[in-house]
Amino acid sequence: MATQNYKVADISLAAFGRKELEIAENEMPGLIAVREKYAKSQPLKGARIAGCLHMTIQTAVLIETLVALGAEVTWSSCNIYSTQDHAAAAIAATGVPVFAWKGETEEEYLWCIEQQLKSFPSGKPLNMILDDGGDLTALVHERHPELLVDIRGISEETTTGVHNLYKMFKENKLKVPAINVNDSVTKSKFDNLFGCKESLVDGIKRATDVMIAGKVAVVAGFGDVGKGCSTSLRSQGARVIVTEVDPINALQAAMDGFEVTTMEEAVKEGQIFVTTTGCRDIIRGEHFNEMKEDSIVCNIGHFDVEIDVAWLKANAKDVVNIKPQVDRYELKNGRHIILLADGRLVNLGCATGHPSFVMSCSFTNQVLAQIALWTDNTSYPLGVHMLPKKLDEEVARLHLGKLGVKLTTLTSVQSDYLGIPVDGPYKADHYRY
């Protein structure tokens, strides 16, 4: 009998996951178009991709796209709460080694990543990394440096992971070429902005059933994620206060009509708090002590360092688990704090993450990055690179038909006047969308 080469919560959920996966495919035109374009040429043949990214239904479509293009794939989730167990089961049932389930411990999380390094069907180790947050990249560099010699490249999904890549490269610790997928326009301006715009409120409402209209919401950070969250909360009728360290982002927030102040001032008024910064220690003990009764506190940044959950656990008189990922802490001053997803990603811990369509944009970039690194590694020396503007525009183009968009075509006269090709790229690399 063959050895079981996966660990998921319940493999019997595979049929349920497959049904949702089929619905998601219809909402992910970019990935399906890439399959159709490259299925015959098999550009990822020989690639052994270890992926560490939220094991959701949308990620399942990404995994099956990589396999359709010739890759061997193993998978773990980049967050202990973000796995959708029916999605993990659906992929494991196809023979892809998946090590992920919702509610892993920290030890189990690292175990899952370790397992995927040596679980490829061919018996050979990984030679490509597809990462979200940088944990897989860091683990291979720190614990398994002997594997780095055969790894052709890394593609990184999120802001936090990209920050770590640039830091590693600056400190001469990065040993493999990497592509920054996060800062592709069709990722950052869509996934980070429009995705958070829908999934943040979904997570808060599923967790608490709270009425957002009329509340005061505090959003820490006004980058693309913060912009999406602030706009979303305002659209629900909340009065939104923004905190920022960057004067440019602060000015943007103010001119968008948001009040901008410090967290020390905002805690006196806020009832819903959302951290979006990618930085640590944004909401600390002194802030909790000033919050109103039953303030809702959550994070939508990648790691769980933005909210000082350790202080909350150490200093609370009592804690009651209301339901999965919803805990009510009683402080020594008698007031209560409602913490969502233990300070981790609220949209994935308390809901199902971003909608399929916007994830198709992000994941199409991931596939193109993997193809570029695998087939053309001479164009990507050691460092952190961006995908060419032409590919960024192609990702957008693949999603227009689904929305019924009709694109205008430049005339030859207009093309000459602007000095750009009729078929693009249409903007310089330094253009800010």
UniProtKB/Swiss-Prot annotation:
Molecular-function GO term, any one: adenosylhomocysteinase activity
Organism of origin: Schizosaccharomyces pombe (strain 972 / ATCC 24843)
Protein name, as recorded: Adenosylhomocysteinase
Entry's EC annotation: 3.13.2.1
Cofactor: how and how many bound: Binds 1 NAD(+) per subunit.
Pathway: Amino-acid biosynthesis; L-homocysteine biosynthesis; L-homocysteine from S-adenosyl-L-homocysteine: step 1/1
Keyword Hydrolase attributed: yes
HAMAP family the UniProt entry points to: AdoHcyase (MF_00563)
Ligand binding (NAD(+)): 158-160, 192, 221-226, 244, 300-302, 347
Family according to the record: Belongs to the adenosylhomocysteinase family.
Reaction equations catalysed: S-adenosyl-L-homocysteine + H2O = L-homocysteine + adenosine
